[in-house]
Curated annotation (Swiss-Prot):
Entry's Gene Ontology BP terms: proteolysis
Annotated gene: lspA
PANTHER family, per the entry: LIPOPROTEIN SIGNAL PEPTIDASE (PTHR33695:SF1)
CC per GO annotation: plasma membrane
Protein topology in the membrane: Multi-pass membrane protein
Function: This protein specifically catalyzes the removal of signal peptides from prolipoproteins.
Subcellular location, record wording: Cell inner membrane
Family to which the UniProt record says this protein belongs: Belongs to the peptidase A8 family.
Designated name of the protein: Lipoprotein signal peptidase
Length: 163
């Protein structure tokens, strides 16, 4: 029988490989020449040498090693914060799966494979599925952490009133 930490690790790994696999499959299609143009969104191939909005692109090849250190450091931290990891295994799986996929791009292609270009009314940075999964994972984690804790504290307060 698996304990809760082992179950959380399995959930984390499942989400990790799902996000990683979907992202790499989409990027493969883009690299093979898939493109799309419309009035709102274009699918175009761009190699991003930096991070969000091409920041830190001046680090060039060193950026991928910095990102590996950050990913490993965060993973080690989470393995020591078992309650945080167990309660947010899905979100962390999303963030890590997407992050590792983007780092792999840096090693294989020299930059992150970006392709979604939103340009209706204004030009937005070109991004990819992994970027969206990182944003969604962090957003859900913050919402759950903030609202769940507030709700839990209110319930504890109400329970202590009736004791």
């Amino acid at each position: 029988m698996l304990n809760t930490t082992q179950k959380s690790l399995l959930v984390f790994m499942g989400v990790f490989f799902l996000i990683f696999g979907v992202d790499q499959a989409i990027k493969h299609a883009i690299l093979e020449g898939f493109h799309y143009e419309s009035l709102v969104i274009d699918i175009v191939l761009v190699f991003n040498k930096g991070v969000a909005f091409s920041l830190l692109s001046f680090l060039e090849g060193g950026l991928k090693y910095l990102q590996i250190l950050l990913i490993l450091g965060l993973f080690i931290f989470l393995m020591r914060q078992k309650e945080l990891f167990k309660s947010h295994a899905i979100e962390f799986g999303m963030v890590f799966g997407a992050g590792v996929s983007n780092v792999l791009d840096r090693f294989v292609h020299g930059g992150v494979v970006d392709y979604v270009y939103y340009h209706y009314g204004f030009d937005f940075a070109i991004f990819n599925f992994a970027d969206v999964m990182i944003d969604v994972g962090v957003g859900v984690l913050l919402l759950r952490q903030f609202f769940f804790k507030q709700k839990q504290n209110k319930i504890k307060g109400i329970i202590t009133l009736f004791k």
